[in-house]
Amino acid sequence: MYAVIVTGGKQYKVAEGEFLKIEKLEVGTGESVTFDRVLLVGNGDDVKIGAPVVDGAKVTAEVVGQGRHDKVSIIKFRRRKHHMKHQGHRQWFTEVKITGIQA
């Protein structure tokens, strides 16, 4: 069984037992999270598509940990002016393990 959920402004295809890195949630490690915005639920040939969400469907997950992604470098360069600006960014994420899909 698989589902497509929306969290942090992004869509993720998830299956039970899968680990996933999503945008940071203010939830402690070991706690449970429920995703109510489920766009699609599939089980073999049986596929339910929401308009826009599937009624009564939810995905539960357990928070495994918090962390930061690798650094992304931003460089702004002005040609012929001897000017360069360098900036780095590391985005926070929450790692979750999908524990159940209910449709």
Swiss-Prot record:
One of its GO terms (biological process) is translation. InterPro entries: bL21-like, bL21-like_sf, Ribosomal_bL21, Ribosomal_bL21_CS. The keyword RNA-binding applies. One of its GO terms (cellular component) is cytoplasm. Signal peptide: none annotated. It comes from the Bacteria. One of its GO terms (molecular function) is structural constituent of ribosome. This protein binds to 23S rRNA in the presence of protein L20. Part of the 50S ribosomal subunit. Contacts protein L20. This is Large ribosomal subunit protein bL21. It comes from Azotobacter vinelandii (strain DJ / ATCC BAA-1303). The lineage of its organism: Bacteria, Pseudomonadati, Pseudomonadota, Gammaproteobacteria, Pseudomonadales. The gene is rplU.
